[in-house]
């Protein structure tokens, strides 16, 4: 990335946040590498701007380009704020997950529609604090329109028996340790489908930033509830390596579809516009607003405080 331009002045509406198992996108032309500094610090990695079918796509490595950030250390606010600031409104996030259900086999993919938060407040999880308050709806944490696009791309996966499950509940645990066996059975009793350490607060922050957001989950193990084998890093790595081509095929197909839809209401997240802004403006009275907090909100939404 060292010889790429560090500025880019054209619209970038679509982003991929790559996690464990998807550290880069292949077959896309890199045209810039941005290193923004947000009011919440620097993002986890430079933001690569890639050209795909004539459409610009941003790629950010959630855990850093060397996987140096543990799940609780990921600068989620900086990641989402930096993407929003360059124009991104539509985010596809990739995550390796453990399966909590027999029918979701290692190497299967899941398009979750619900999430249960089992993080512990260690991770900063809102943009609206310190003198500005906002309460944003999160009943349906993922974007139904983006989920529909992902589901139509299942045909691009290869391999016997590999399935794309069209819904499910992802449990997000604190980590970085894996679950105890008792916890794993508890999550199953709650109706959890898969488990990871990354989807929150990322999805909550994307909602606050008025972005369409959908996670694609790739099962790498059966967590520790299953008698098959206890989860460990070696097992996760084995399945990720075996299925990395399918992960890249699926994400590539999704980007093909989204590139065709660039500038559409879905990609521009028109259906989320105003959700946060109304909540923030009506909650904190002008005399109670902290000037520094107002500047931070302005970074997300330029012109936010103008009447």
From Swiss-Prot:
Keyword terms: Cytoplasm, Glycosyltransferase, Nucleus, Purine salvage, Transferase
Cellular component GO terms held in the UniProt record: cytosol; nucleus
Residues the record lists as binding phosphate: 20, 62-63, 95-96, 198
Claim: Cell division is one of the keywords in the record: no
EC id: 2.4.2.28
Pathway stated in the Swiss-Prot or TrEMBL entry: Amino-acid biosynthesis; L-methionine biosynthesis via salvage pathway; S-methyl-5-thio-alpha-D-ribose 1-phosphate from S-methyl-5'-thioadenosine (phosphorylase route): step 1/1
Principal location class: cytoplasm
Site (Important for substrate specificity): 179, 233
Keyword field contains Nucleotide-binding: no
GO BP terms in the entry: glutamate biosynthetic process; L-methionine salvage from methylthioadenosine; purine ribonucleoside salvage
Amino acids binding substrate: 197, 221-223
Cellular localisation: Cytoplasm; Nucleus
Known catalytic reactions: S-methyl-5'-thioadenosine + phosphate = 5-(methylsulfanyl)-alpha-D-ribose 1-phosphate + adenine
Entry GO MF terms: mRNA binding; S-methyl-5-thioadenosine phosphorylase activity
PANTHER family the record matches: S-METHYL-5'-THIOADENOSINE PHOSPHORYLASE (PTHR42679:SF2)
Quaternary state and interactors: Homotrimer.
Task of the protein: Catalyzes the reversible phosphorylation of S-methyl-5'-thioadenosine (MTA) to adenine and 5-methylthioribose-1-phosphate. Involved in the breakdown of MTA, a major by-product of polyamine biosynthesis. Responsible for the first step in the methionine salvage pathway after MTA has been generated from S-adenosylmethionine. Has broad substrate specificity with 6-aminopurine nucleosides as preferred substrates.
Similarity section: Belongs to the PNP/MTAP phosphorylase family. MTAP subfamily.
Name by which UniProt lists this protein: S-methyl-5'-thioadenosine phosphorylase
Annotated source species: Fusarium vanettenii (strain ATCC MYA-4622 / CBS 123669 / FGSC 9596 / NRRL 45880 / 77-13-4)
């Amino acid at each position: 990335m060292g010889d790429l331009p560090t500025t880019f002045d054209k619209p970038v509406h679509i982003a991929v946040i790559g996690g464990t198992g998807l550290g880069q996108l292949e077959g896309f032309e890199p045209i810039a590498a941005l290193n923004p500094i947000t009011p919440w610090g620097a993002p986890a990695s430079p933001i690569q701007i890639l050209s795909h079918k004539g459409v610009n796509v941003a790629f950010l490595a959630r855990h850093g380009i060397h996987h140096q950030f543990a799940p609780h250390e990921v600068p989620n606010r900086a990641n989402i704020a930096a993407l929003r600031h360059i124009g991104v409104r539509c985010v596809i996030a990739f995550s390796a997950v453990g399966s909590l259900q027999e029918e979701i086999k290692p190497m299967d993919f899941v398009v979750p529609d619900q999430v249960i938060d089992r993080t512990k407040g260690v991770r900063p999880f809102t943009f609206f604090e310190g003198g500005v308050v906002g309460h944003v709806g999160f009943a349906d944490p993922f974007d139904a329109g983006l989920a529909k696009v992902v589901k139509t791309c299942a045909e691009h996966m290869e391999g016997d028996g590999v399935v794309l499950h069209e819904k499910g509940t992802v449990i997000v645990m604190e980590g970085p340790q894996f679950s105890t066996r008792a916890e794993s059975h508890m999550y199953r009793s709650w109706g959890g489908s898969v488990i990871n350490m990354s989807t929150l607060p990322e999805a909550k922050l994307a909602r606050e930033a008025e972005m369409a957001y959908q996670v694609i989950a790739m099962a790498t193990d059966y967590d520790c509830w299953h008698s098959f084998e206890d989860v460990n890093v070696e097992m996760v790595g084995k399945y990720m390596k075996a299925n990395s081509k399918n992960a890249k095929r699926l994400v590539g197909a999704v980007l093909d579809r989204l590139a065709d839809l660039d500038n559409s209401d879905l990609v521009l997240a028109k259906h989320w516009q105003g959700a946060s802004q109304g909540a923030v403006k009506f909650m904190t009275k002008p005399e109670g607003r902290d000037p520094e907090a107002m500047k931070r909100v302005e970074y997300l939404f330029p012109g936010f405080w103008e009447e």
